[in-house]
Regions:
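Secreted/periplasmic proteins that engage bacterial cell-wall peptidoglycan
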Residues: 38-77
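Extracytoplasmic/secreted cell-surface and envelope-processing proteins
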Residues: 48-49, 121-124
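Extracellular/periplasmic catalytic domains that process cell-envelope and extracellular macromolecules
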Residues: 29-32, 54, 105-107
Length: 138
């Protein structure tokens, strides 16, 4: 009985993991655009040395360790390190990995997922963040 429950729980967990992101990224170059500029403005005011000690978020895009791990997981290799969060170009690459794996990508979904994880687009806590991003895009 325990094994059946565990198997069902594991199956449910695995099936929800792919609901909000595409396992295969969109194969197209993604340039720096208004969304990325808005996210950098909101996250750090374009400061590559910005650091939020409370969240251990670093760099121009305020990347936390969990995001580095997630990007590496999506790429299926350890391409990025925590040190790369301080590098603007590598931070942008990580943002673009997340963006390219976002299912049904819109600026809102990408921004809210960047702020709140793969289910960020459904969290009330990311609405205020999205409003800040929209103000920057205007």
């Amino acid at each position: 009985m325990k094994q059946t429950i565990l198997s069902i729980s594991l199956l449910a967990f695995i099936s929800t993991q792919s609901m909000w992101y595409d396992k295969q990224p969109i194969e197209q170059p993604i340039a720096i655009d208004t969304l990325l500029m808005a996210v950098m403005a909101v996250e750090s005011n374009f400061d590559t040395m910005a650091y939020n000690e409370k969240e251990n978020a670093a760099g121009v895009l305020q990347i936390r360790p969990i995001m580095v791990r997630e990007v590496n997981r999506l790429l299926d290799k350890d391409k990025y390190t925590l040190k790369d969060r301080w590098n603007k170009a590598k931070s942008i690459e990580m943002f673009n990995v997340i963006r390219s794996h976002t299912k049904n990508p819109t600026n809102e979904r990408i921004a809210r997922n960047w702020n709140g994880g793969w289910n960020g687009h459904k969290k009330k806590s990311t609405l205020k963040y999205w409003q800040k991003i929209k103000q920057q895009i205007k």
